[in-house]
């Protein structure tokens, strides 16, 4: 199992410094979200041009605000800047964001993703797109000098989205999904669908908060506050319920080095191919202890 790290909320200079340190520490990958801050692909274009080894990934870019051709052009540009080290993770986001903030319809999200992929997949493969659907059309090709085909992952939690990910992409990327749910739901559903579609082995990239600490109880209280929104968003709530977790703090990997190591190993045993650590800390000793454990696992 490969080990990556996740970062959000930094300036561009801080992101470059973080990526440089992650590469020096031996991490396999660096993942950046597209939320309400830096443009993830623009930021990774800069990182990819400056940091020579790390795989760079988005976890994830919402589909609705951008036409597939615009997203593909950004991804191919980041690919060109990084020598082909970009993996594009995309997702539906959430109804409260898409309708309440962006003003788009969230009707039939699986249909939306299926049509989006019909346009996006060929463009990421450096092939022309020729698709007309109910919600979007794409009849064009892109030419980005130096770009290589970009692997694609879909943030898939429910069965229909997992089946779609298996049929059309390289796999899935998950957040706030625990090892029991991965082992009993996510990985088997994805694998079965890939076997039926003949698409081969699937990649399962899974992220969770991680902290090595002597104050497990105190840091779990802190995690409950920091990550509380994920306990209310329906798609993540469904995964927490499958896991038997009362909230995000229950799936976070928090505690002694031995306990956190065992938690990461459970993710591997569940079928995760890439574990992404969201390094969660409140002080320097926790940050140092967490990073040291992760380095031991690389």
Named regions from a protein language model:
Residues 1-298:
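Active-site-adjacent structural elements that line small-molecule/cofactor binding pockets in enzymes
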